[in-house]
């Protein structure tokens, strides 16, 4: 029951955020005359894009258990970490750590800039996580995540 209330609360927060003046119009975030460009087709199943404070975009290749990043300055993709616990959704906290939903063993991870990982939790409300999927971190470092039953 507490899990249902947590999910409803999260959805309510998401709805409030999406209807607030903080949401950008797509015309404001997509540069005029922008062109879609294929950066790479070497991945199996990508997930969880998140931008670091430098503008690099990190993403997971979940079946291959790796995290990569696209360096916006060089336009090259580099491997950041392998053996990620089959990371899915990602988000950067205010200290520059990459948080991941690592669903292989139902865990939420924190990975520092050097690629050193720490398991933050494997449970919520006394129950083991099923398969964390996506997450978001608020300005007070509160972590919100989805944990669906597949």
Can you annotate each of these PLM segments?
Residues 6-17:
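Bacterial N-terminal signal peptides
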């Amino acid at each position: 029951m507490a899990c249902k209330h947590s999910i409803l609360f999260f959805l309510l927060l998401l709805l409030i955020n999406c209807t607030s003046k903080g949401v950008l119009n797509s015309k404001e975030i997509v540069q005029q005359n922008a062109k879609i460009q294929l950066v790479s087709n070497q991945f199996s199943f990508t997930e969880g894009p998140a931008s670091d404070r430098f503008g690099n975009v990190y993403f997971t290749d979940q079946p291959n258990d790796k995290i990569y990043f696209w360096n916006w300055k060089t336009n090259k993709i580099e491997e950041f970490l392998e053996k990620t616990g089959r990371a899915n959704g990602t988000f950067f906290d205010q200290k520059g750590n990459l948080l991941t939903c690592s669903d292989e063993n139902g865990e939420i991870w924190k990975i520092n800039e050097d690629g050193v990982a720490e398991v933050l939790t494997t449970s919520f409300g006394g129950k083991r996580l099923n398969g964390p999927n996506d997450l978001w971190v608020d300005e007070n470092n509160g972590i919100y995540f989805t944990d669906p039953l597949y």
